[in-house]
């Protein structure tokens, strides 16, 4: 375009620009009529006279980042043009706010810092529809907000300047919950006081050194009890073993006596034969053949057996039996008085 063409161009056809600097330090050149749609920028240009050059760019608020500022400029370009119908504006606004919750919050904050009230109202209504019907926990989850309020702060009474009955009922509910919370805190403090350590300094020192004084005493007591219990068990086992040994010895003695007594009928039947002269001569012949030392040994054994038989028979069997009395003749034979039974031959058979 030549200089002559620029000279004949009307002033209204030439666009003027304003220099704006965003939060990240980048500088943009924006049409004046679009930038002036934001009240904050308009005040800076009129009151301070800045923005006419790159060296005197208008610094935008910290909350206005390049991405949000680009969206705001698109909104201003559409709405600052005359001749738009309300239906067109409404359709554009509905499409414009279709974004995620995080970006919608950032856009609301940036529009508020630029004092662009129509855009603030639009984004605020969109956020209101998102949180409608949600409880506090769900709202904190949607906006990723930390729960930094204590239970008491959550239950603080609400201001009711208009005397709303719903707020009155809500404050009553909060008062009841605060009372329950205080009661739980009181019970918790009581439990903590009950668990206070009341041990002496010596016990604490013992615990710090690695051994608890009470635990040591308890362990010693347990060891003593265990030792006594083991001694009782050992003594009872010894008594039981002794009784078993005595019982076995008695049973063995009874068996010996019984085996001896089974020979008594045979001895009784042979009593008459033994008392005859011929039998006596036979015994005398046998006695003559036995060595005198052996005969004396046999006589002592027979006498010991007779004494043991008379003393243990009745006690071991537990029955009353008629004792059998034996005597030893001068020739080494044994005979029974009062029913004289000679047991010389059985004794000889048993010993040999």
UniProtKB/Swiss-Prot annotation:
Compositional bias segments (type: Basic and acidic residues): 239-249
Compartment(s) of residence: Nucleus
Pathway as given in its UniProt record: Protein modification; protein ubiquitination
Protein name (Swiss-Prot/TrEMBL): SKP1-like protein 20
Subunit structure: Part of a SCF (SKP1-cullin-F-box) protein ligase complex.
Region (Interaction with the F-box domain of F-box proteins): 108-167
Coiled coil: none
SMART domains named among the record's database cross-references: Skp1
Function noted in UniProt: Involved in ubiquitination and subsequent proteasomal degradation of target proteins. Together with CUL1, RBX1 and a F-box protein, it forms a SCF E3 ubiquitin ligase complex. The functional specificity of this complex depends on the type of F-box protein. In the SCF complex, it serves as an adapter that links the F-box protein to CUL1.
């Amino acid at each position: 375009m030549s200089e002559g063409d620029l000279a004949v161009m009307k002033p209204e056809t030439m666009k003027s620009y304003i220099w704006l600097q965003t939060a990240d330090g980048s500088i943009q050149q924006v049409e004046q009529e679009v930038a002036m749609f934001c009240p904050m920028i308009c005040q800076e240009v009129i009151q301070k006279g800045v923005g006419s050059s790159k060296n005197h760019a208008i610094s935008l608020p910290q909350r206005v980042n390049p991405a949000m500022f680009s969206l705001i400029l698109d909104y201003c370009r559409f709405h600052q043009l005359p001749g738009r119908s309300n239906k067109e504006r409404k359709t554009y606004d509905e499409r414009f706010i279709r974004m995620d919750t995080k970006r919608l919050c950032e856009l609301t904050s940036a529009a508020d810092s630029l004092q662009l009230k129509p855009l603030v109202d639009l984004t605020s209504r969109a956020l209101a529809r998102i949180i409608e019907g949600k409880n506090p926990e769900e709202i904190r989850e949607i906006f990723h907000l930390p729960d930094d309020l204590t239970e008491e702060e959550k239950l603080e009474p609400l201001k009711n300047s208009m005397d709303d009955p719903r707020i009155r009922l809500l404050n009553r509910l909060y008062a009841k919950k605060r009372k329950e919370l205080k009661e739980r805190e009181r019970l918790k403090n009581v439990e903590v006081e009950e668990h206070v350590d009341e041990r002496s300094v010596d016990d604490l020192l013992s615990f710090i050194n690695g051994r608890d004084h009470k635990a040591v005493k308890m362990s010693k007591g347990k060891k003593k009890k265990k030792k006594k219990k083991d001694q009782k068990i050992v003594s009872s086992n010894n008594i039981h073993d002794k009784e078993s040994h005595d019982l076995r010895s008695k049973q063995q003695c009874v068996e010996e006596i019984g085996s001896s007594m089974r020979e008594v009928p045979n001895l009784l039947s042979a009593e008459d034969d033994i008392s005859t002269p011929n039998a006596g001569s036979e015994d005398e012949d046998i006695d003559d053949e036995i060595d005198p030392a052996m005969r004396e040994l046999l006589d002592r054994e027979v006498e010991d057996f007779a004494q043991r038989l008379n003393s243990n028979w009745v006690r071991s069997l537990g029955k009353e039996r008629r004792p059998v009395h034996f005597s030893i003749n001068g020739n080494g034979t044994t005979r029974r008085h009062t029913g004289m039974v000679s047991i010389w031959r059985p004794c000889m058979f048993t010993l040999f």
